[in-house]
């Protein structure tokens, strides 16, 4: 399965996509928690392709209960196992600190499309379940081709 296929699969399952919505709301606590999870320096870094695969596993494993879920990351970190765990954590921390990884929280509810195509890349859009929005999203990254997807969130 390609990275594009993985992304589109997640888009069709929004419950798995909005898990990390309020990342920067609890930014310093998250970084501290992640840093405590790192046991040792990785022997090597992950390729961009492998980084994306591991990030998707991580994001899918997070609970979708708002910012508090970021303060309890242990279960989600278990999704990244084996030799890549240490490297993934180091790269995740580095990307967060440098703002290379951007997780956006949208605060607009409505039926009009939100055009996010002018945002800097790479980025992931992860929304909380209480939002209802139709979003057109352009994702660009070195490991991903341009992908335009539309998806809807409706709060039950």
Curated annotation (Swiss-Prot):
InterPro entries: HI1480 (IPR037180). Signal peptide: none annotated. Gene3D superfamilies: 1.20.272.30. It comes from the Bacteria. This is Uncharacterized protein HI_1480.
């Amino acid at each position: 399965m390609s990275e594009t296929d993985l992304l589109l699969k997640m888009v069709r399952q929004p419950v798995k996509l909005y898990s990390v919505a309020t990342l920067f709301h609890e930014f310093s606590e998250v970084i501290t928690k992640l840093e405590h999870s790192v046991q040792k320096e990785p022997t090597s870094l992950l390729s961009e392709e492998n980084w994306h695969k591991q990030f998707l596993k991580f994001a899918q494993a997070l609970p979708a209960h708002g910012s508090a879920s970021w303060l309890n990351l242990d279960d989600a970190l278990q999704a990244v196992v084996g030799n890549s765990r240490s490297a993934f954590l180091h790269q995740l921390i580095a990307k967060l600190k440098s703002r290379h990884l951007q997780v956006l929280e949208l605060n607009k509810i409505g039926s009009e499309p939100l055009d996010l195509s002018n945002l800097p890349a790479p980025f992931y859009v992860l929304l909380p379940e209480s939002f209802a929005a139709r979003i057109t999203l352009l994702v660009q990254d070195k490991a991903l081709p341009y992908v335009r997807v539309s998806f809807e969130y409706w709060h039950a």
